[in-house]
Amino acid sequence: SDLFQIIKDTMELKDIDIMNYSPLTLAYIGDGIYEIVIRTIIVDQANRQVNKIHKAASNLVKAHTQAEMIFAIMDKLTEQELAIYKRGRNAKAVTRAKNASMSDYRTATGFEALMGWLYLTNKSERMMLLIKEGLSIIEMEEDSK
């Protein structure tokens, strides 16, 4: 069972239509779930000092890397996933990420909205497949530099 479903059942959360959420709300939850995934991967890779773990995680969750992720997996997205990404990317954000261009920030917001939507629609396997694919493409690009 998906983590979202377990949380929903345990905490007796009401059923809501995910499409009623604003794209920035999807991005908010997507940011959190993506961070959990990245932290899980990094902690599993090596038992290191927490500050080194944090630095490694921060590099993968920053707006620029999230923008690279979505570009890496763009051709793998379904029409619906692409539409969710675009809703997030085009949302009018009040704030701007520190150390990020507006372009990267908006693109990353789209990526986070997609992650949030996949999580909230119990599509965690799909979410993980896209994250794995994106990370492997980014790593290959880094290695070829």
Regions found by a protein language model. Give the residues of each.
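Double-stranded RNA-binding/processing signature
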Residues: 1-145
